[in-house]
């Protein structure tokens, strides 16, 4: 029992050491990217957008930074997702229905909104009516995903052309910008002394009473006590009868509250799994939201005390969940269990992710791993090699010299201690003499590797 507790404490210590070095955002990086420059860029872009288009100025309600720097972001914060909410006049009169063809999506009928706007004498509201009717809805008054996307794309392009795709947000430092669209996002890439990207994602604001949630999810929504949710204009493939007018339901504010209301071990585990995903080249198809979704399900399935377990226990359990979901080829959308979020991936893509993840729970539990190996396991799985090299301030030559010394010293000591000049495991040795034969034992070389791994100098 005591040995088990000591191992548990050792594992926790190594995880938190790794977290501090490779998972947490360094304070200077958070200020550099998540602070003044990022805020100044967003203020500048939307100042121009509002000025160039009075209609957009009326309907933009607020901004929210998803996966905020202090909560779920990891390491160097150079990618951001910012949701800007579009609140149309009389938005509570939008007729919201579940998309019968696409789980997790809704249809937005603007008929009643247009009627109310038509009877409203205010000039700015008349311009909004003309915008909706002329550019954003189809003949049946349903909001069209691609029309909203095209309208916003033209506005972003105009705004960036206005400043020649460059800004000086810090005195004497010019940043160059590039713009593209991908899915629902309007992405701006920043180059120069400050390098990062921002996905600006539009979201149509809807009232709490307009939700179309199943019973269990509705309970979560009510518990969070939020007054709104959003519909995201996410283009869909393949095309269906409704895909052009189908918007993805989004409950980011509710998700944020659910994650904040449990112990920080939950959020730390999410960040570790995201770091693991970033380190592994064959997990490119594992989106951050898939990981977040697994934790949302866990929150409603387990008592609050679950999150008081050691971080190593939670991580192993959540990697088990991820592996099992990938094995079955299903990650269920939290807000509509009928939607399999990885359904669009091929079987080979899903299986590749499964093979990468399936061994991790066993290794995290560390039952058959020496402490030295476990130390390196944590480094290897939750940090990039380049990060480790920088942290160790260790040159390639120094690595080779240290490894060479470890091999010579460890083999000599091990052989002399074990064999004393006798025939062992098919290898003849003499006292004080080291010779590596073709039948060198695995345990000998494992011992050498353990010593190097414990120093974090060799993989």
From Swiss-Prot:
Uppermost EC category: transferase
* Ways its activity is controlled: The enzyme activity is specifically activated by some nucleic acid.
Q: Where are the transmembrane segments?
A: none
- What keywords are assigned to this protein? Antiviral defense, ATP-binding, GTP-binding, Immunity, Innate immunity, Magnesium, Manganese, Metal-binding, Nucleotide-binding, Nucleotidyltransferase, RNA-binding, Transferase, Zinc
> Any keyword Magnesium?
yes
- Which GO terms fall under biological process for this protein? cellular response to virus; cGAS/STING signaling pathway; defense response to virus; immune response involved in response to exogenous dsRNA; innate immune response
Entry's EC annotation = 2.7.7.-, 2.7.7.86
The yes or no answer to whether the keyword Nucleotide-binding is present is: yes
Question: What Gene3D superfamilies would the database entry show?
Answer: 1.10.1410.40, 3.30.460.90
- Name the coenzymes or cofactors required: Mg(2+); Mn(2+)
Q: Which residues bind Zn(2+)?
A: 263
Q: What does this protein do?
A: Nucleotidyltransferase that catalyzes the formation of cyclic GMP-AMP from ATP and GTP and plays a key role in antiviral innate immunity. Directly binds some unknown nucleic acid, activating the nucleotidyltransferase activity, leading to synthesis of both 3',2'-cGAMP and 2',3'-cGAMP second messengers. 3',2'-cGAMP and 2',3'-cGAMP bind to and activate Sting, thereby triggering the antiviral immune response via activation of the NF-kappa-B transcription factor Rel (Relish).
Query: What is the recorded name of this protein?
Result: Cyclic GMP-AMP synthase-like receptor 2
Q: Which organism is it from?
A: Drosophila melanogaster (Fruit fly)
Task: Show the taxonomic lineage.
Answer: Eukaryota, Metazoa, Ecdysozoa, Arthropoda, Hexapoda
Q: Which gene encodes it?
A: cGlr2
């Amino acid at each position: 029992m005591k040995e088990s507790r000591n191992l548990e404490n050792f594992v926790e210590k190594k995880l938190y050491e790794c977290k501090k070095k490779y998972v947490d955002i360094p304070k200077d990086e958070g200020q550099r990217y998540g602070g003044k420059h990022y805020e100044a860029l967003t203020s500048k872009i939307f100042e121009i957008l509002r000025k160039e288009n009075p209609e957009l100025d009326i309907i933009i309600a607020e901004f929210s930074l998803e996966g905020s720097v202090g909560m779920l972001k990891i390491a160097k914060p150079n990618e951001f997702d910012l949701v800007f909410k579009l609140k149309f006049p009389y938005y509570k009169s939008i007729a919201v229905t579940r998309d019968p063809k696409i789980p997790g999506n809704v249809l937005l009928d603007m008929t009643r909104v247009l009627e109310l706007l038509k009877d409203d004498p205010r000039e700015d509201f008349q311009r909004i009516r003309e915008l909706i009717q002329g550019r954003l809805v189809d003949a049946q008054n349903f909001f069209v995903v691609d029309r909203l996307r095209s309208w916003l794309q033209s506005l972003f392009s105009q705004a960036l052309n206005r400043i020649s795709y460059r800004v000086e947000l810090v005195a004497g430092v010019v940043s160059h910008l590039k713009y593209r669209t991908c899915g629902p996002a309007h992405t701006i890439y920043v180059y120069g002394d400050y390098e990062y990207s921002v996905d600006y994602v539009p979201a149509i604001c809807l009232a709490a009473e307009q939700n179309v949630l199943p019973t269990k999810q509705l309970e979560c929504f009510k518990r969070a006590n939020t007054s709104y949710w959003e519909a995201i204009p996410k283009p869909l493939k393949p095309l269906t009868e409704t895909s052009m007018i189908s918007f993805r339901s989004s409950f980011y504010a509710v998700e944020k509250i659910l994650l904040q209301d449990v112990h920080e071990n939950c959020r730390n585990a999410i960040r570790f799994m995201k770091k693991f995903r970033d380190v592994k080249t064959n997990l490119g198809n594992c989106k951050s939201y898939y990981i977040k979704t697994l934790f949302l399900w866990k929150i409603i399935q387990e008592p609050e005390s679950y999150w008081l377990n050691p971080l190593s226990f939670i991580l192993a359990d959540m990697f088990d969940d991820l592996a099992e979901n990938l094995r079955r080829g299903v990650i269920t959308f939290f807000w509509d269990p009928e939607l399999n979020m990885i359904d669009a991936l091929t079987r080979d893509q899903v299986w590749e992710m499964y093979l990468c993840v399936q061994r991790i729970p066993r290794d995290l539990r560390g039952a058959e791993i020496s402490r030295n190996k476990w130390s390196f396991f944590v480094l290897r799985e939750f940090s990039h090699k380049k990060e480790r090299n920088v942290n160790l301030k260790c040159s390639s030559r120094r690595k080779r010299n240290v490894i060479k010394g470890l091999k010579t010293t460890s083999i000599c000591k091990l052989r002399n201690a074990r064999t004393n000049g006798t025939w062992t495991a098919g290898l003849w040795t003499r006292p004080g003499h080291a010779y590596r034969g073709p039948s060198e034992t695995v345990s000998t070389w494992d011992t050498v590797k353990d010593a190097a791994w414990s120093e974090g100098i060799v993989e």
